[in-house]
């Protein structure tokens, strides 16, 4: 069973994604805090980490930077999916520097979003 970690401070989105993944057979951990998420990432193994960019305590980019203590840049590009409602040129440029998948919120096509988060 694949293990997914969702880092999202909007509880409705967090819980909706958790239920969708669990229905598809995934094991799912969640966190609303970027700082707590970092601690969890460093001690757990995840097949995919889906991280909102704008968290209440730190940014999703901060989570990725701290994850470099465990993962190589190549691993980060394969494991992380960044979710954001902000797609400014600066955000896109920084996301591209990590070579992570970028998923815009709100999701226009839920099936497509789920595919991008799991492939």
Spans of features found by a protein language model:
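Two-component/phosphorelay signaling modules centered on CheY-like receiver
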Residues: 11-29
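Alpha4 helix (beta4-alpha4-beta5 surface) of REC/receiver domains from two-component response regulators
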Residues: 62, 86-104
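Active-site residues of response regulator receiver
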Residues: 52
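Conserved acidic carboxylate
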Residues: 8
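Acidic catalytic/metal-coordinating carboxylates
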Residues: 33, 59-65
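Acidic, metal-coordinating helix/loop segments flanking the phosphotransfer/catalytic sites
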Residues: 30-48
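The feature encodes the CheY-like receiver
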Residues: 56
